[in-house]
Amino acid sequence: HAIVQVEEMQAVNAVLYGKYTMEGDQFDTVEVDFGRSEGNNIEQADGKKWSEQDRDTFDPTHDIDLYCDQASGLVNIAIMDGTVWRLLNGFKLFREKLDTRRGSNSQLETAVKDLGAVVSFKGYYGDLAIVVAKTSYVAEDGTEKRYLPEGTLVLGNTAAEGIRCYGAIQDAQALSEGVVASSRYPKHWLTVGDPAREFTMTQSAPLMVLPDPDEFVVVQVK
């Protein structure tokens, strides 16, 4: 599970920031930067903050369209945390345009399958699928934290794809066994003694790659 969490964290940070940092006890800290354009990470400024707008008269459509225009391709999904959802759903004009009765979308269902407990599909805003995510990870101090920082809105496309890359395992036993390309290298060994002990370990060197970081636009909503 620890390896899966590293993969998830790399993938999430690649989407949120267009880069992430790799750290470890046995190698120097490395920043993996995919070269996202500055305009694809947006922070709402004073006067533009949704929290400052009138709930009955403000229409967020114009802002959302401007944000989507920053993406390198078509945007068809908006993923947000609960804070952003509550703000958006608080606007009367947003609620009037939100379509919660449209038929299912097989591609969207595939994108969020097996995530029913932490992902909620709210409906369509025009052609934009509205999804609230509550996915989390376990931090180094043992506490559970959300992958999406509070007030985060991610705009992207359900067809966007990353690449799972894996480095070589520096393990003499793996080399002696003629290890082939794989995402995991499990091993076990015995220690002599009374009692004898058996140990197991799984090694991996993941590197999640986002070929086009500008496919996504990330907005800090305030």
Give the residues covered by each predicted segment.
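Sequence/fold signature of self-assembling virion shell proteins
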Residues: R95-E96, T100-K222
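A generic structural signal for short, solvent-exposed coil/turn residues
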Residues: G24-Q26, Q70-S72, T191-V192, L210-P211
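Short, glycine/acidic-rich hinge or "gate" loops at secondary-structure transitions
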Residues: E8-Q26
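Glycine-centered flexibility motif
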Residues: G18-K19, G39, G47, D127, ...
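Extended, solvent-exposed, turn-rich assembly/linker loops in the middle of proteins
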Residues: F27-E109
